[in-house]
Amino acid sequence: MLYQKLGRTDCEVSVLGFGCMRLPLQHGLERATDIFDPTKPINEEQAIAMIHYAIGNGVNYFDTAYPYHGGQSESLLGKAVSGYRNKVLLATKSPIWMIEETTDFDRFFDEQLGKLNSSYVDFYLLHGLNRQSWHRIKELGALDFLDKIRADGRARHVGFSFHDEVETFKEIVDSYDWAMCLIQYNYFDEHYQAGKEGLQYAASRGLGVVVMEPLRGGKLTEGIPAQVQAIWDSADVSRTPAEWALRWVWNHPEVSTALSGMSTMAQVEQNIQIAKNARVNPLTPGELEIIARVTSTYRQMLKIDCTGCAYCMPCPNGVDIPLNLSLYNDTFMFKDSEIAYMLYNHMLAPEQKASNCAECGECEEHCPQHLEIREELKRVHERLTGE
């Protein structure tokens, strides 16, 4: 297993991290939303076996959060790492959307420490920051809270996860002495949200960068379109789509570790085998060209020609325009698009949804693709809700 230093910290992290959002369920996964449903119990025996196998094979970074598996994920992880605490790095996140007053920061954090059966976490993140939530929680004293838990030892390091445009990302990076950040990054989303620009910016400021969705929630590895598979098959080297995707992420020296939300032992075994062969900058120019062709082929399937540049942002009404258009495109590009429906209907804040568009037209004035965004947002809401 390859290990890399996480930013300015003293932590050496495995290049493969274990994301605990998609653990196996007792009765199987019927819908994408099951991973947030407290009535869908985790299959503890299988999940703990997977985590123990990962630890035994060198994985040391484990990521969870308050809402994962309807609040069960942190407890399961705490149980799984009992007796292994000195071998692992635990990261969890503050449910900032549930914070209504300053005392809530401590209340939720203490509850999370109890679930994790630990007196401290290695990394505590503000979960899912965007422009609106960032300014709101700052006013509630989030940064003073982070200072406090670092000083009293309940959190060794602090960071944030992020879902918004790159200028907001840079603002947040420069606003506090963060140890690390967590961003979405894969070969299809190279310029989406924080993207490559944000990745390099954070690393240049000394932050460790952890990548989520390196396989885009499994969409880059399952249900591969025939025209994409043909490109993979044309390569001089035989690799699974998962290996291509992970190697692409690891080809960026700014990345410390890539999280994979694994739900079966087979996935754990496969990803660990890939990670054991990992090295920094592992792709040749010819291999990068193969990935570029795959990306181009996927993009030709786009229904809305949005590049994710975010020139349309910020929306004065709070709509996350690039995210809405991306979710809409996902429903056409990938065979399994249920995650797009789940995110729109269950994860986006009301103001972020396409339905919150006031049709002011300000976004269209700034769109370099000259998209009819107001009309597109109507189609987005109709397709993702059936209304």
Sequence positions of predicted segments:
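N-terminal binding-site loop/beta-alpha segment at the start of enzyme catalytic domains
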Residues: 1-88
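A general structural detector for well-ordered alpha-helical segments in enzyme core domains, enriched
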Residues: 2, 46-50, 73-80, 108-112, ...
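Structural preference for beta-strand elements that scaffold enzyme active sites
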Residues: 5, 13-17, 60-61, 87-91, ...
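Conserved residues at the C-terminal ends of beta-strands
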Residues: 19, 65-68, 124-127, 161, ...
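Glycine/proline-rich, positively charged
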Residues: 27, 32-34, 97-212, 223-229, ...
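Structural motif
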Residues: 53, 57, 115-116, 176, ...
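Structured C-terminal cap/extension of enzyme domains
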Residues: 55, 60, 79, 197-387
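Alpha-helix-loop-beta-strand connector modules within alpha/beta enzyme cores
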Residues: 74-92, 144-152, 204
